[in-house]
UniProtKB/Swiss-Prot annotation:
Example of a GO MF term: beta-glucosidase activity
Signal peptide range: 1-20
Family, per entry: Belongs to the glycosyl hydrolase 3 family.
Segments traversing the membrane: none
Keyword Signal listed: yes
One of the protein's GO biological processes: cellulose catabolic process
Name this protein carries in UniProt: Probable beta-glucosidase F
Gene, per the UniProt record: bglF
Length: 866
């Protein structure tokens, strides 16, 4: 079972049952120097959004007739390795609801076959192409559906990339909330157009891999984030993705403001379900469930994979324990009904009740036959892999994304594009393949050959791999290859020869350590791996023309060689997936002009970043990760600190040039009030009888054949559990069953719909002024006035558009819309979004990077070219 070692590695980070982590204790930490997450109860019911009304009506009819066992079955996983998927719920055969399959990953079906390994999220972000973001989502959804996956665990919009060394930044779309928001929301729309359910992750503050999970000696770290920073930065892409209709949200491992995400009532009940109007279901990250009653009351709807503190022992915080909690009254039956209704309504909303496939693969083995429940001591066997090919023509989309993401940082003397008759010398193992096999390392937990993706659960097996070496050899008959990370002796260099040096930087999830890096880039830092810097310098000493190709998970330091005279060009190819070679040669040899742009800043030194975004650790006690930099991460920090980076956010050159002319700013809807119009009232939600179910509903069925370690909803003594209903149970601090007033910032999925009123529109004419075809990206940044009374970043990306391929001399007019929310700050006192009245003092900039602004507009004064 290929995935088994990976999950065994998780055991070192498990949450033990004896670990003291009660919500009540967390919520009483009120010292002014300590972060605090206030209580927010009860959990809001779903079903009040009109777009979900039909699905909730169907769910209500079914749930009204379910037994307690059937309800609990859908909220709890059946246990790790107790089915074909990363996790699966129980089923309700009486109503045609199967075991729901939840499975990775954000870039392709994990641990499967005949699937596409798409470029990673960071690569998609670098395209700045909304159409490709959506198309990739469609491809992911089609492949998930084809494999029988009900819930695909992605996209990831958290981490956002606060910490440049963070291990999983590459799963998201870039170090900016708007870029993440467009990437996440468009991916969700694409995925769910196919009927697959997207599970948006990780809510929230999982910005570092090390110490995120609790262990026998310490709790996972607490991400301590102030309310304004939470809303304007980290929550922003989640809000946009909820607005896109996300069916599921995955909760992170860590704490937020000293309250574990899986039972953080403010985060789940207050912000996600009430303020953002989330209508789907909330699921744990795998083994992130640390308590039973407290998590249910805090708004958690599904536990995955269902196991308790130590997997493989057949224990659970829910399953039969949830049945017990409902019978004894510690979990109100109303809460269970809402949990189940949310799950079933999402199933109906995506049309999964109509001819949706069952799982036809196994993530546990590549064999055709095997145990149906691999985690059981004794398991029946059968066909587990049907080898269904779901790739379709998705390789075309994968290649287009990988190609359009390639970012040209430098091109002195126009050394690129190459001519097919150039004499080339290629260096670096990153140009080649993994000699052990392209899928030989579990979850890509090694760095051998071309880097196509990071490592961890967010990966996919490669159906094939076109390496740069193969692709270049296919085009050039004058290429010599030195697939080594040590510069070979005896290499000769003619005056016109061109050296292409391949280097990379890797990272991933913390259950695998690669070359001393436990997920985060702890040992390597932001330097190239495998002697990369020295390899470039050695080539630069020998050759007059050096092209550097970088495959990387994020920012990488280049100072040792970037200014060398012979280093003429640098391409960042990000994480290209299976089409690594063809996408690169499309650009290298000029079939296409590069049109990618950096989705993060590349610094001169790691010391350019604020100290607070470094990796944090301590030997004992819970780590307090204080977000003292506030809104100022990545380019926002560089601008505030007046630090010129090596390459700014949004930077990307082309083989041609573009002019931005004829800018025009139009008022679409007046900002005549500081705060948005009053939110619409909540609609009605499903109602159910409030009487406790009969204990017999969770009694073991007669002659039932139990599977060892399978997690069931049944109790050995249900009558005994019901008899305890007269007892008084302790509840989390602040718990109440009285509904709270509807938050004024809410009113629809994502928040008050007035926030998305388009207030201004900028039009700009983009002209190809060069001699080659190419595409330009217009990036719109806003600067908010000091009249708001708050410190705000001097530039904030809020919109972007990409031209079609423009021939030399051809133009296209782009329209970039700006919403009320785009111009708002979060008022922590009023608890609403505040904008400058009439947009007074707002400045809008449009350009090709945050440092290359071509157009400036001032509301009320108009626009000019810069």
């Amino acid at each position: 079972m290929a995935a088994f070692p990976a999950y065994l590695a998780l055991l070192s980070y498990l949450v033990p049952g004896a670990l003291s982590h009660p919500e009540a204790k967390t919520l009483t930490s009120r010292a002014s120097t300590e972060a605090y997450s206030p209580p927010y109860y009860p959990a809001p019911n779903g079903g009040w959004i009109s777009e979900w009304a039909s699905a909730y009506e169907k769910a209500h009819r079914v749930v009204s007739n379910m037994t307690l066992a059937e309800k609990v079955n859908l909220t709890s996983g059946t246990g790790i390795y107790m089915g074909p998927c990363a996790g699966q719920t129980g089923s309700v055969p009486r109503f045609g609801i199967p075991n729901l399959c939840l499975h990775d990953s954000p870039l392709g079906v994990r641990n499967s076959d005949h699937n596409t390994a798409f470029p990673a999220g960071i690569t998609v972000g670098a395209t700045f192409d909304k159409d490709l973001m959506y198309e990739r989502g469609v491809g992911l959804g089609e492949e998930a559906r084809g494999k029988g996956i009900n819930v695909l665990l992605g996209p990831s919009v958290g981490p956002i990339g606060r910490k440049p060394r963070g291990g999983r930044n590459w799963e998201g779309f870039g170090a900016d909330p708007s870029l993440q928001a467009f990437g996440g929301s468009l991916t969700i729309k694409g995925m769910q157009s196919t009927g697959a359910i997207a599970s948006l992750k990780h809510l929230i503050g999982n910005e570092q891999e090390q110490h995120r999970m609790s262990s026998v000696i310490t709790q996972g770290y607490s991400s301590n984030i102030d309310d304004r920073t939470l809303h304007e930065l980290y929550l922003w892409p989640f809000a946009e993705s909820v607005r896109a209709g996300a069916g599921s949200v995955m909760i992170a491992y860590n704490d937020v403001n000293r309250s574990a995400c899986s039972q953080n009532s403010k985060l789940i009940n207050g912000i996600l379900k009430d303020e953002l109007g989330f209508q789907g279901f909330v699921v744990t990250d795998w083994l992130a469930h640390i308590g039973g009653v407290s998590s249910a009351l805090a708004g958690l709807d599904m536990s995955m994979p269902g196991d308790g503190a130590i997997p493989l022992l057949g224990t659970s915080y829910w399953s039969w324990e949830l049945s017990r909690s409902v019978l004894n009254g510690s979990v109100p039956v109303e809460r269970l009904n809402d949990m189940v209704t949310r799950i079933v309504a999402t199933w109906y909303k995506m049309g999964q009740d109509k001819d949706y496939p069952l799982p036809n693969f196994s993530s546990n083995t590549e064999d055709e036959t095997g145990p149906l429940y691999p985690g059981a001591l004794f398991s029946p066997s059968g066909i587990v892999n049907q080898y269904v090919n779901v790739q379709g023509n998705h390789n075309v989309t994968a290649r287009a994304i990988a190609r359009d993401a390639i970012t040209l940082l430098k091109n002195n003397d126009n050394v690129l594009p190459l001519k097919r008759n150039n004499t080339l010398k290629i260096f670096g193992t990153d140009a080649g393949t993994n000699s052990d096999g392209i899928n030989s390392c579990t979850d890509k937990g090694c760095n051998k050959g071309v880097l196509t993706m990071g490592w961890g659960s967010g990966t996919s097996r490669l159906p094939y791999l076109i390496t740069p070496q193969e692709a270049i050899a296919n085009i050039s008959s004058n290429a010599g290859f030195h697939i080594t990370d040590t510069f070979p002796s005896g290499v000769t260099a003619g005056p016109d020869d061109i050296a292409i040096v391949f280097i990379n930087s890797d990272s991933g999830e913390n259950y695998i350590t690669v070359d001393g890096n436990p997920g985060d880039r702890t040992l390597a830092g932001l330097h190239a791996w495998h002697n990369g810097d020295n390899l470039v310098k050695a080539a630069a000493e020998k050759f007059s023309n050096v092209v550097v190709v970088v495959h990387t998970v994020g920012p990488i330091l280049m100072e040792e060689w970037i200014d060398l005279d012979s280093v003429k060009a640098v391409l960042v190819a990000h994480l290209p997936g299976q089409e690594a070679g063809w996408s690169l040669t499309d650009i290298l040899f000029g079939d296409y002009s590069p049109s990618g742009h950096l989705p993060y800043t590349i610094p001169h030194s790691e010391s350019d970043y604020p100290e607070s975004v470094g990796l944090i650790a301590q030997p004992f006690g819970q780590i307090q990760d204080d977000y003292t930099e506030g809104l100022y991460i990545d380019y926002r920090h560089f601008l505030k600190a007046n630090i010129t980076p090596r390459y700014p956010f949004g930077h990307g050159l082309s083989y041609t040039t573009f002019n931005f002319t004829e800018p025009n700013l139009s008022i679409i809807k007046a900002l005549d009030t500081a705060y948005p119009a009053a939110r619409p009232p909540k609609g009605s939600t499903p109602t159910y009888p409030t009487a406790k179910p009969d204990a017999s509903e969770v009694a073991w069925p007669k002659n039932f054949n139990r599977i060892w370690r399978y997690l069931y909803p049944y109790l050995d003594n249900p009558e005994g559990a019901a008899a305890n209903s007269s007892k008084t149970y302790p509840y989390p601090d602040g718990y109440t069953t009285e509904p709270k007033p509807a938050p004024r910032a809410g009113g629809a999925e994502g928040g008050n719909p007035a926030l998305w009123d388009v207030t201004f529109s900028v039009q700009v004419k983009v002209t190809n002024t060069g001699s080659r075809d190419g595409r330009a990206v217009a990036q719109l940044y806003v600067e908010l006035p000091s009249s708001l009374g708050l410190d705000t970043p001097s530039r904030q990306l809020r919109q972007f558009e990409k031209t079609k391929i423009l021939a030399a001399g051809e133009s296209e007019v782009l329209t970039l819309d700006v919403t009320r929310k785009d111009l708002s700050v979060w008022d922590v006192v009023v608890q609403d979004w505040k904008a400058p009245v009439n947009g007074e003092g707002v400045k809008i900039w449009v350009g090709e990077s945050v440092a290359d602004l071509r157009v400036g507009c001032v509301v009320g004064e108009g626009c000019s070219t810069l």
